[in-house]
């Protein structure tokens, strides 16, 4: 219980100052305009949490996927392990880590990275495995080595599935990062809990999280379209 209360005790509860709309706990555009600056730092913290966690998670899952691709027997245990981690309630995982690594940005990152693995690893290994054997045989017939086939044939063909997993992992991380305040990492979740009963505050902080998830998703989608020009050509 003390681990749960510590992050809450560190929150600087915001006082509400405004007219009738604020006192009646309505949706107050004027209050929002006057207080937008208080959301800048939490938003930047949220972006940092998401970007670092997804980047680290991608690097780890990429290495695991390459390892499992060459040693197929590893696929099942790695998939099972990532699935088990994802079943752990997010708040519980943050609180489990706090006594070990303390209240910090990196405590939140460890938890968020762990949650990305179930999407990233599964999509990466599926993308590599689903490359048709006849395509790889044709590449070998042209004189390409196994390493060249991996990077010139298998990896490009796996890109759509890999980036699909990245989109899901990123959106999920934006969502889970709202709970990073339990690890003392701030973010939009901390802003929400500063005044969770005030509708305007919750709407703005929650809306920013949704907007952030949409922007990440659109950015990855644009990258996917640039990396898979053959799909655009087929669509036209």
Please place each PLM-identified region on the residue numbering.
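Loop-to-helix entry region at the N-terminal start of transmembrane alpha-helices
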Residues: 38-49, 95-119, 201-205, 209
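Membrane-embedded alpha-helices of multi-pass transport/permease systems
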Residues: 59-64, 107-136, 159, 163-174, ...
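Cytoplasmic-entry segments and transmembrane alpha-helices of multi-pass inner-membrane transporters
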Residues: 64-97, 122-126, 130
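Short helix-to-coil transition segments within interhelical loops
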Residues: 128-158, 185
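Transmembrane alpha-helices
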Residues: 51, 114, 146-179, 210-211
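Hydrophobic alpha-helical transmembrane segments of polytopic membrane proteins
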Residues: 188-224
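Short cytosolic juxtamembrane segments of multi-pass membrane proteins
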Residues: 224-236
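Periplasmic/extracellular loop-to-transmembrane helix junction in inner-membrane transport proteins
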Residues: 4-53
């Amino acid at each position: 219980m003390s681990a749960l209360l510590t992050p809450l005790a560190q929150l600087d509860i915001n006082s509400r100052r405004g007219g009738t709309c604020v006192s009646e706990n309505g949706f107050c555009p004027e209050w929002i305009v006057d207080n937008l600056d208080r959301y800048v730092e939490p938003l930047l913290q949220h972006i940092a949490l998401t970007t670092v966690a997804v980047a680290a998670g991608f690097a780890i899952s990429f290495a695991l996927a390459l390892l499992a691709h060459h040693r197929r027997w590893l696929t099942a245990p790695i998939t099972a392990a990532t699935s088990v981690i994802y079943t752990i309630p997010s708040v519980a995982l943050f609180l489990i880590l706090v006594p070990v690594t303390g209240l910090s940005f990196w405590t939140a990152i460890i938890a968020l990275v762990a949650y990305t693995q179930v999407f990233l690893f599964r999509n990466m290994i599926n993308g590599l495995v689903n490359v048709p054997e006849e395509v790889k045989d044709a590449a070998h017939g042209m004189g390409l080595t196994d390493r060249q086939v991996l990077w010139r044939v298998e990896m490009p063909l796996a890109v759509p599935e890999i980036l699909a997993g990245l989109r899901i992992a990123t959106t999920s991380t934006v969502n889970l990062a709202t709970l990073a305040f339990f690890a003392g990492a701030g973010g939009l979740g901390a802003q929400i809990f500063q005044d969770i009963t005030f509708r305007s505050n919750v709407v703005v902080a929650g809306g920013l999280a949704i907007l952030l998830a949409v922007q990440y998703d659109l950015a990855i989608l644009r990258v996917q379209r640039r990396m898979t020009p053959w799909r655009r050509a087929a669509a036209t």
